[in-house]
Amino acid sequence: MFDVSFTELIVIGVVALIVLGPERLPKVARTVGHLLGRAQRYVHDVKSDIQREIELDELRKFKQQIDSTAQDVNQSLRSATDSLRASGDSLRAELDDTARTVNEAAADIQRTIAPHPAITAETDTSKLPGTPATLPATAAAEPTPAAPAASQAEAPKSPSTGNAT
């Protein structure tokens, strides 16, 4: 602590022995030892208090940094949540508009397809304008020109042997 060498201690002891005498020297040495011990303990306590305050100060700074970072993260999460909610609300509004348009179009189609009250199952459809009259029976029975060509293509061919039969 004071950086005193052994030779310096011997010199101090000899001077104390001469000044104090052999009767009082042990008592004074004991008292000086107790005082030095108290001083060392006091210095140690002050050092530890200062060290604790420094650590507390560092911890406070660290806590403040963590708190500010947490607030920044919380703020960014809130802004992201708000923007997502706004996007979701706009999408919901667009989907509602689209659904309304589709429902209106479906209702228009249903009104267009629904039979008019004047037309019923009992009404003769051949008398309606734009409906062709009944087809003649001969037209339905006649084969189309593509049908004979197909039947000729399907007929098995006899192998030609070169002999005319």
From Swiss-Prot:
The keyword Transmembrane helix applies. It is a single-pass membrane protein. Residues 67-84 have a biased composition (Polar residues). One of its GO terms (molecular function) is protein transmembrane transporter activity. It holds the Pfam family TatA_B_E. Its main location: membrane. The keyword Phosphoprotein does not apply. GO terms for cellular component: TAT protein transport complex. Residues 67-165 are annotated as: Disordered. The chain crosses the membrane at residues 1-21. Gene3D superfamilies: 1.20.5.3310. Residues 127-159 have a biased composition (Low complexity). GO terms for biological process: protein transport by the Tat complex. Keywords: Cell inner membrane, Cell membrane, Membrane, Protein transport, Translocation, Transmembrane, Transmembrane helix, Transport. It is found in: Cell inner membrane. The Tat system comprises two distinct complexes: a TatABC complex, containing multiple copies of TatA, TatB and TatC subunits, and a separate TatA complex, containing only TatA subunits. Substrates initially bind to the TatABC complex, which probably triggers association of the separate TatA complex to form the active translocon. Part of the twin-arginine translocation (Tat) system that transports large folded proteins containing a characteristic twin-arginine motif in their signal peptide across membranes. Together with TatC, TatB is part of a receptor directly interacting with Tat signal peptides. TatB may form an oligomeric binding site that transiently accommodates folded Tat precursor proteins before their translocation. NCBIfam families: tatB. Belongs to the TatB family. This is Sec-independent protein translocase protein TatB. It comes from Bordetella avium (strain 197N). The lineage of its organism: Bacteria, Pseudomonadati, Pseudomonadota, Betaproteobacteria, Burkholderiales. The gene is tatB.
